[in-house]
């Protein structure tokens, strides 16, 4: 049977997913903090850090740990979906501090090679900031639940905040 649910209801359910919303909020705040750290530590305003990978803190770690924490908080930490979310979080964090970091270090060394070694001139240097140090992953993984759980507990779904004055039409009795 075909589901006749209106598409706006599906979109509303998607945007009303508190675990997803607060995981994304944790990711966004972690990414935004990179801009302020750049300003504080290097005394320069460089908005490009908002779309770059790597650096302090790991926004991907904040995303997956924030989402996993919300799933555990709402469904229970013994729920199979929390186990899945936690395993995905571990894989993402391992990848960020292991494989992606190694790829970035390799790119750094390749970029340091003299141009005379190449049969043709490279168009642009390889991207070096790919992964994270363990500290960057740790800070991101702590930021995730620290942002997502209070948001989930005290605010709930941000969609509910925007719809406080909007209610479903009621029919007169």
Which residues are covered by each model-predicted region?
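Polybasic, low-complexity association/targeting segments
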Residues: 1-23
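N-terminal signal-anchor/start-transfer transmembrane helix
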Residues: 22-38
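Membrane-embedded catalytic cores of phosphoryl/pyrophosphoryl-handling enzymes
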Residues: 28, 32, 47-163
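N-proximal short alpha-helices
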Residues: 2-9, 37, 76-83
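Charged/polar, solvent-exposed surface patches and flexible loops
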Residues: 13, 112, 168
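Single conserved hydrophobic/aromatic residue that forms the stacking wall/gate
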Residues: 164-173
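Helix-boundary and loop/linker segments of multi-pass membrane transporters
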Residues: 11-16, 41-42, 76-77
